[in-house]
UniProtKB/Swiss-Prot annotation:
SUPFAM superfamilies reported for this sequence: Flavoproteins
Annotated InterPro entries: Flavoprotein-like_sf, RNR_Ib_NrdI_bac, RNR_NrdI
Species of provenance: Salmonella dublin (strain CT_02021853)
Gene Ontology terms for molecular function: FMN binding
Functional note: Probably involved in ribonucleotide reductase function.
The name this protein goes by in its record: Protein NrdI
Top-rank taxon, per record: Bacteria
A biological process from GO: protein modification process
Pfam families per record: Flavodoxin_NdrI
Family per similarity comment: Belongs to the NrdI family.
Gene3D superfamilies linked to this entry: 3.40.50.360
Length: 136
C-alpha cells in the first residue's frame, strides 16, 4: 500500500482520526516554515476551513505543500473532513483539491470521524491502491 499524507490543525481532529485509522501516514507540519517532500504516490487527508464557503477552505499549509510540484505530482486522491454545520459545503476542501489536482475525491467524514468512517476509509484506501496498481 502507498502513503497517506495529512494535515491537522491545532484542534487535532484529523490527527486523532489518523491515529485511529492506524495506517502509515506523514503529517504536514503546522509550522508553515517547515516543509516536507513526499517521494511516493499518496492520498491526502485534509480538514476544511472557513465556515462553509470555498474561499479559505483549504488550509494554507496544505496549499504550500501542494504548490511544491514534486508533492503535487504524487497526489492520487483526497479525503476530506469537515463539519456538517457548513451544510452542502462540509468537507469542501476535498472538492477544491480534487478539482485543482485532477484526482478523485474519495471520502469525507465529520470532525474526527466515527468507527464506521474508520472502517470505510481503511477498506476504501486498500481497494483504491489495489485498483490503481492493476491499472498501471
Amino acid at each position: 500500500m502507498s502513503a497517506l499524507v495529512y494535515f491537522s490543525s491545532s484542534s487535532e481532529n484529523t490527527h486523532r482520526f489518523m491515529q485511529r485509522l492506524g495506517l502509515p501516514a506523514t503529517r504536514i507540519p503546522l509550522n508553515e516554515r517547515e516543509r516536507i517532500r513526499v517521494d511516493e504516490p499518496y492520498i491526502l487527508v485534509v480538514p476544511s476551513y472557513g465556515g462553509g464557503g470555498m474561499a479559505g477552505a483549504v488550509p494554507r499549509q496544505v496549499i504550500r505543500f501542494l504548490n511544491d510540484e514534486h508533492n503535487r505530482a504524487r497526489i492520487r486522491g483526497v479525503i476530506a473532513s469537515g463539519n456538517r454545520n457548513f451544510g452542502d459545503a462540509w468537507g469542501c476542501a476535498g472538492d477544491v483539491i480534487a478539482q485543482k489536482c485532477g484526482v478523485p475525491w474519495l471520502y469525507r467524514f465529520e470532525l474526527m470521524g466515527t468507527q464506521r468512517d474508520i472502517d470505510n476509509v481503511r477498506k476504501g484506501v486498500n481497494e483504491f491502491w489495489q485498483q490503481l496498481s492493476r491499472s498501471a
